[in-house]
Amino acid sequence: MSEEKASEVAEAADLVLNGYAVTRDGENFRVVNLYSGKAAYVMASGELSETNMDEVESEIACRIVNENRRYIVAA
């Protein structure tokens, strides 16, 4: 992902943490790795719905959403 695009994604995000940008989509969440550009869609239940991330990145994305949900929802 280009630096310019990563900056745009980060600016639009509700939360940026450890290189991952999280954006609410209704009750669900979009998570983008700002370095690789890979993304995940995490359901309101905390379960992973779709991703092009590897297993480790997917786990990180889910953990970020689940552990920081109160900050994302308050945004």
Regions found by a protein language model. Give the residues of each.
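Acidic, low-complexity, intrinsically disordered interaction modules
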Residues: 23-54
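Negatively charged, low-complexity tracts enriched in Asp/Glu with abundant Ser/Thr
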Residues: 1-21, 48-62, 66-75
